[in-house]
């Protein structure tokens, strides 16, 4: 999906990406002091503004990473416009995003203190991306009738990559040891490919992709550490 595309394709791309990554935007607005309701309204209004002004089309390949673009754009939106708009004008009542405020507020209570707003945003962005990738992996394995394989081996994609006792897993899944190792290898390969595909949808070049991948890996490693 090319971020530089115009017209309906660009609009659909923006809708999909913002739908997937609304929580980092919501969390950022909350940390700027907005109430839960105001934060939700602000993100909805911000999204409508992006659609109205075709901002995805302007955030072309030379602009680099969509993550950085959205963070800067939302920060400016909150500072320059949001606080000056009346509640009656906030998106005109339209709510194009599906925002689960209850879930978001619960998640915010689990966040670690001591980091900056931008660090929190990047971490939440990284987690949203990983959750999106896991969803794709789960659907892929379900389509192949391999749900049990995914559920039993998905630990190989997390933390230190361990996934349990190989012999025990082989017996449980009715695979050989080599079959388990092959399944783990393929799952890791597909995981990396999906991560790169998701990132590619938010950047303008292969160089940006490599930078973004490296950055998000550091973000996750720092949080886990």
State what each model feature region is:
Residues 1-225:
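Intrinsic, short, N-terminal disordered tails of RNA polymerase sigma-factor systems
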